[in-house]
Curated annotation (Swiss-Prot), chain B:
Family: Belongs to the RRP40 family.
Job of this protein: Non-catalytic component of the RNA exosome complex which has 3'->5' exoribonuclease activity and participates in a multitude of cellular RNA processing and degradation events. In the nucleus, the RNA exosome complex is involved in proper maturation of stable RNA species such as rRNA, snRNA and snoRNA, in the elimination of RNA processing by-products and non-coding 'pervasive' transcripts, such as antisense RNA species and promoter-upstream transcripts (PROMPTs), and of mRNAs with processing defects, thereby limiting or excluding their export to the cytoplasm.
Localisation per UniProt entry: Cytoplasm; Nucleus, Nucleolus; Nucleus
UniProt protein name: Exosome complex component RRP40
Annotated keywords: Acetylation, Cytoplasm, Exosome, Isopeptide bond, Nucleus, RNA-binding, rRNA processing, Ubl conjugation
Superkingdom of origin: Eukaryota
Modified residues (N-acetylalanine): A2
Amino acid sequence: MAAERKTKLSKNLLRMKFMQRGLDSETKKQLEEEEKKIISEEHWYLDLPELKEKESFIIEEQSFLLCEDLLYGRMSFRGFNPEVEKLMLQMNTKNKAEEVEEQTVELDVSDEEMARRYETLVGTIGKKFAKKRDRAIYEEDENGDIKPVKAKKMFLKPQD
Amino acid sequence: MAEAAGVPAESLAGCRARAARTVLDQVVLPGEELLLPDQEDGDGPGGAGERPLRLNAAARSRGRVVCGPGLRRCGDRLLVTKCGRLRHKEPGSGSGGGVYWVDSQQKRYVPVKGDHVIGIVTAKSGDIFKVDVGGSEPASLSYLAFEGATKRNRPNVQVGDLIYGQFVVANKDMEPEMVCIDSCGRANGMGVIGQDGLLFKVTLGLIRKLLAPDCEILQEVGKLYPLEIVFGMNGRIWVKAKTIQQTLILANILEACEHMTADQRKQIFSRLAES
């Protein structure tokens, strides 16, 4: 009796993860697509023609700071408040400095030299802290460069 | 008189929009429409009212034009909303198409984000202070918005203190909020303004005139005697000098210099320098 009548499982049950492990990849893809279709059909959308966004060239601002270069609001004259005088110099030159282009900072050591030093540094320091087994990884090439580290063998989780 | 007044009104209503370039530094009235420079291509004596916006290379290379206070965007044109002189600033670093604004005069301040203002603390409620900045609503100032303030270490602010701060939120839909630190967390001169001194109110236009980079008034004032001034964009100025008399003289000068010519000012300063 039981063999004659196939138990009809519900769609939700079939969609569950443990039921899908036995399916092929093709049927899985089909099911996914169907699901996506259902979801996207349920999403509401406006049935209007596509409106082109008008690119506006005009921006509205209500602040006077953009319009006029105003000085900093706190001022002190003839040494009445030395902190404020220091602030005055700082803030007013900050405004002017933004207009002047930035100058490149002079470096003591060039970038290329830094890169070269780091390349060799990583290897030598790494060797110091590597365990005996790993020290074999740091074999030196003919040129004296350190070979790249090989991938360690780790525990791989078995796939379903 | 009625006839003479009627004729100019008619002509204004009937005239087309003018090019902004031609009206620079002239008085404009609310309701006027201004054309931006690259929209005058088809403008001639027989030009029609509607000009389609051509998205050619010329239009795109214009970049963004900023319309500042006193102007509003109206389609592709600028609509004047305040009466005053039209000003223009060229773009400095090449981005955008410059700034247009109307230089108007008013006494009532409307909070604007980023403005540094002087406020008077009117109430302390819980974690915030209510600060009167001269706008329609008192601004709120959190006690954590001071340099070095933590929950345990509260700033020493009492009702009636003067605060120099800037707005972080200021629009017509919400209550304005101000802080006394900048985005990096440093005070930069903001916070409670010290003891003594005198606070008085002037028009907003005078503040901008005094804070202009090449202001002669301040340079001359600075030579008189040691003093300290704080300008708030809401029309409030706080001054302090060594004696009460000097402070009062300073306050009177600053209030009066709005309506004086340069000669009158120089006369007054020379008289003061003698005494």
